[in-house]
A protein has these predicted regions:
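Active-site-adjacent helix-turn-beta-strand microarchitecture at beta-sheet edges
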Residues: 1-12, 213-215
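Short, charged/polar, Gly/Pro-enriched secondary-structure boundary elements
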Residues: 182-186, 212
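His/Asp/Glu-enriched, well-ordered alpha-helical/loop segment
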Residues: 6-16, 23-46, 51, 56, ...
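P-loop/Walker A phosphate-binding loop and immediately adjacent motor/lid segment at beta-alpha junctions
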Residues: 187-208
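Glycine- and charge-enriched low-complexity intrinsically disordered segments
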Residues: 205-224
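Ligand-binding beta-strand-loop-alpha-helix segment within the catalytic cores
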Residues: 68
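C-terminal regulatory/interaction regions
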Residues: 10, 178, 219-228
């Protein structure tokens, strides 16, 4: 893994690695550290995905080399792995740091959010609700930070912060119109999406064919088991 990271970094490629569990996180960070030691690159924005069970010391090392984190906040309330089950397997201390969003933000890491759909509900506002209602109070984040996780931060992680991710003159006009303010609404996950605009034009959903209906049915069957 170190050899791969060193080679890709030398070529100027942005690297993204999955890391679930503290051992996997250790392998991943060690590989990135080896790559940066071989060729320093301040603006690489290399990424770790998931980053479950990372220790604070590991996250400090990630912050030192400016890694970005691609988290999946809906796993915080994933009913396939309830808190009682996780505690029985991992213990309370490790369970509490499964998705350490608060620690990541306090250390200055850039964190983007996703759903890992269809494993969890593919709805950004649902993820935002999970982020601000983490069962461990120390790992909860502010609504504004959670909003950035689904807007500006992913754009930065893909080197597109000058094109998308915020509503500003000159940016690509991809945005949604919401029925309420996610920074103040009582039920973030329940906010209705009133409209979707792509490149400044209102998007109208086309009639779904048989394949689309089947895909939606499968996703609904998978995801309805884990809704909070």
């Amino acid at each position: 893994m170190n050899e791969f990271a060193i080679g890709a970094n030398r070529e100027g490629w942005q690297i993204t690695m999955h890391a679930i569990g503290d051992a996997a996180v250790e392998q991943c960070i060690t590989a990135y550290e080896a790559a940066y030691a071989d060729k320093p690159w301040d603006d690489a924005r290399h990424v770790m995905i998931h980053v479950c069970l990372a220790s604070e010391e590991q996250l400090k090392r990630a912050a030192k080399i400016k890694l970005c984190i691609a988290a999946q906040s809906p796993f915080i309330y994933w009913k396939q792995e309830p808190d009682e089950y996780l505690c029985s397997v991992l213990g309370r201390e490790r369970t509490d740091r499964l998705n350490a969003l608060g620690t990541m933000h306090r250390l200055g890491l850039v964190v983007g959010d996703g759903s890992d759909g269809p494993c969890t509900r593919p709805k950004p506002l649902y993820g935002m609700a999970c982020s601000v209602n983490h069962p461990n109070p120390d790992e909860r984040i502010s609504r504004l930070d959670a909003l950035r996780m689904i807007t500006a931060n992913p754009a930065y992680m893909s080197h597109e912060e000058n094109k998308r991710g915020t509503l500003a003159p000159g940016m690509i006009a991809d945005f949604v119109v919401l029925g309420d303010d996610p920074l103040t609404a009582e039920d973030i996950a329940g906010i209705e999406v009133k409209a979707l605009y792509l490149h400044g034009k209102k998007h109208v959903a086309k009639k779904t064919g048989v394949a689309g209906l089947l895909a939606r049915a499968i996703i609904k069957r998978i995801t309805q088991r884990e809704y909070i």
